[in-house]
């Protein structure tokens, strides 16, 4: 099956046209091929694999080698989709580490690397990677690699000062070269404000319906996450009959603005 190549420029065009798009995590060739065949434009090899595939309680144990291995697999299944890959915990704490590890992940097949957080040191890394032809996606709000700082997986940006800081960080990430921005577990109104403030596409997870795109961990989208699912998750497999139909439903509901609904969002 021949599929149109999806690029960062594609997502920028969609933002300008107010066209919503879906994204999903993927970890192997079988699922990435299935997702691509249903029209999924963007996939993420996330460090969430530490929890979903490896059984850890956080994303912190995931290594660059883990990400590279799964990126190669996902790329084989979805050669024409836009593929993001996380730089995992402590893999970009120095410029030398960021450069080496980003190169490893890009060689494995990623189109863009994602790093978490804001602040001057992050902005410098984003700028230096971008200058060396490595596209970077930022990630603000609930950044799972900072779980021990946050004291758990908690909503971010509810206080006025925290919201202002997130807006400033989003603007700075764009200024220093970030191509995309993931917004996780922040109030819907704040995500809307950030999306309107910056020109790069935003991708939300638990950030309401006003971001340019939406992303879900595949296990959440298919209702196979252990324990209680997060508030923002929806089981698209329920009532669908098969995984292909479930993924088609997810894509359709995002594109039509039906998902996320109010019950999946934080106010």
From Swiss-Prot:
User: Pathway it acts in?
Assistant: Cofactor biosynthesis; (R)-pantothenate biosynthesis; (R)-pantoate from 3-methyl-2-oxobutanoate: step 1/2
InterPro entries named in the record: Pantoate_hydroxy_MeTrfase, Pyrv/PenolPyrv_kinase-like_dom, Pyrv_kinase-like_dom_sf
Which Pfam family, an example, fits this chain? Answer: Pantoate_transf
Which key words are in the record? Pantothenate biosynthesis, Transferase
Report the catalytic activity: 3-methyl-2-oxobutanoate + (6R)-5,10-methylene-5,6,7,8-tetrahydrofolate + H2O = 2-dehydropantoate + (6S)-5,6,7,8-tetrahydrofolate
- Quote the cellular component terms of the Gene Ontology held in the record: cytoplasm; mitochondrion
HAMAP family, alphabetized: PanB (MF_00156)
The name of this protein is Probable 3-methyl-2-oxobutanoate hydroxymethyltransferase
Identify the species of origin: Schizosaccharomyces pombe (strain 972 / ATCC 24843) (Fission yeast)
> What does the record give as the organism's lineage?
Eukaryota, Fungi, Dikarya, Ascomycota, Taphrinomycotina
């Amino acid at each position: 099956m021949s599929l149109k190549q999806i690029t960062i420029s594609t997502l920028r065009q969609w933002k300008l046209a107010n066209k919503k798009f879906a994204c999903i995590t993927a970890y192997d060739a079988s699922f990435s091929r299935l997702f691509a065949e249903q029209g999924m434009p963007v996939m993420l090899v996330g460090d969430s694999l530490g929890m979903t595939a490896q059984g850890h309680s956080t994303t912190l144990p995931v290594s660059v080698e883990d990400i590279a291995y799964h990126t190669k697999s996902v790329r084989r299944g979805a050669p024409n989709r836009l593929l993001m890959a996380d730089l995992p915990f402590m893999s970009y704490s120095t410029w030398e580490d960021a450069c080496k590890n980003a190169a490893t992940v890009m060689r494995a097949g990623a189109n863009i690397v994602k790093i978490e957080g804001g602040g001057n040191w992050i902005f410098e890394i984003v700028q230096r990677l971008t200058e060396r032809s490595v596209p970077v996606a930022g990630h603000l709000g609930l950044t799972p690699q900072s779980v021990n700082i946050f004291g758990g997986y908690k909503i971010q940006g509810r206080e006025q000062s925290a919201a202002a800081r997130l807006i400033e960080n989003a603007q700075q990430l764009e200024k220093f070269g970030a191509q995309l921005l993931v917004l996780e577990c922040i109030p819907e109104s704040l995500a809307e404000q950030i999306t309107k403030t910056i020109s790069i596409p935003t991708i939300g997870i638990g950030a309401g319906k006003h971001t340019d795109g939406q992303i879900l961990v595949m296990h959440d989208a298919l209702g196979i996450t252990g324990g209680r699912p997060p508030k923002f998750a929806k089981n698209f497999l329920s009532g669908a009959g098969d995984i292909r139909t479930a993924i088609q439903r997810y894509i359709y509901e995002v594109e039509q603005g039906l998902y996320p609904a109010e019950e999946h969002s934080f106010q």
